[in-house]
């Protein structure tokens, strides 16, 4: 009986430790994915005046404006 209780407690303890470790790894995996997406977007370059900008960044000095056909990079309003 004592041996069974010790084994149950040991299994529960080890399960709790491994569950905690896997939760932390999942967070780091998500952070790594976000960093990878940023690197991919940065490598694509910026969008020039008149280019569509829904999911991409406009070049410096331009902003993504809305229109009937979707967003396009254009100079900011004064």
From Swiss-Prot:
Location(s), subcellular: Secreted
Keyword Cell inner membrane set for record: no
A Pfam family this chain is assigned to: Conotoxin
Bridged cysteine pairs (disulfide): 46-59, 53-64, 58-73
Family per similarity comment: Belongs to the conotoxin O1 superfamily.
Domain remark from Swiss-Prot or TrEMBL: The presence of a 'disulfide through disulfide knot' structurally defines this protein as a knottin.
Official protein name in the record: Conotoxin Bu2
Keyword list, A-Z: Disulfide bond, Ion channel impairing toxin, Knottin, Neurotoxin, Secreted, Signal, Toxin
Main location: secreted
Lineage: Eukaryota, Metazoa, Spiralia, Lophotrochozoa, Mollusca
Tissue specificity of this protein: Expressed by the venom duct.
Domain of life: Eukaryota
One Gene Ontology term, aspect cellular component: extracellular region
Propeptide, residue positions: 20-41
GO molecular function, one term: ion channel inhibitor activity
